[in-house]
Amino acid sequence: MNDRMPPNIEYQSGHGAGAAVSAESTVPLVVDLDGTLTPTDTLFESLVQLLKHSPMQIIRLPLALLRGRAGFKHFIATHSSISADYLPYRQDFLDYLREQKSKGRRIILATAAHESIANKVAAHLGLFETVLASNPDHNLKGTAKLQAIREQIGPVFVYAGDSSADLPIWRASSAAVLVGVAPAVAARVREEVAVEREFPKAGLEFKTWLRALRVHQWLKNLLLFVPLLTAFSFLDVEKLTTMAVAFLAFSLAASATYMVNDLWDLQSDRQHPRKRFRPFASAQIPIHIGLAVAALALVLSFVMSVFV
């Protein structure tokens, strides 16, 4: 048994959402924010808002990076604002936290996100008795977060996280709560520490990408082939090839535009009863992945247009 476990509490390691403690735990539960409490990354959320509302600050980003991670996060947070009210939260995990809170368990938010964001989330949810977060001088991640937890909470705690960056904290904890953790990382955690609960991450389905790319809108670009039909040139292989490349170029450019627009409208989409379920608004697809795919689609569209 983990030597950091209180003797009156028995933990069970296990697999799947059913892995649980066999007795109600009174050990403080320390919770991560990005990727755990919410599937999104609040730094990228803030960066998108900065680009949208303060585009001239882009020229200052390289200088902000020279300040280190803590300084960069502070710069982004200072020049942007995201609403904690409409962030996408992991509902199953949130329900678990509320259940534990109702039973008198101490719950602490410990995150590498900037303190301004963490405090907004804490105020909105009303679950946390203490907030530990990054500030202008310290980036609270990995071993730095572990040190802060030990100083504020003590050596006995359960930690809820989502990534390999949390491994040092899990190793020092009494037990782990795994939220959306990759199978390989989860296996490493189970080898070293008992697991209190697991909340598996839903897989990213192919149809989610189809929705994000708005592939159904590509049908409009089939109008490019109409001149071939009216000129009875639909059997001309060279012209068909040219139109096919043009079709793909237009379609990829349109998809990139739709994705950028969705990222631009994240906060407003989350307040809409239907749009809040879109892939980016619901954080089914991470922001940085969306930006990369949109950029790739634009590059491919440009390259194809050269040959049309």
Give the ranges of each region predicted by the language model.
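The start of beta-strands in P-loop NTPase/AAA+ ATPase cores
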Residues: 27-29, 157, 257
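Alpha-helical transmembrane segments of integral membrane proteins
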Residues: 44, 219-223, 238-249, 289-293, ...
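Active-site neighborhood of HAD-like aspartate-dependent phosphohydrolases
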Residues: 10-77
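Acidic (Asp/Glu-rich) catalytic motifs at the cytosolic membrane interface
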Residues: 160, 253-279
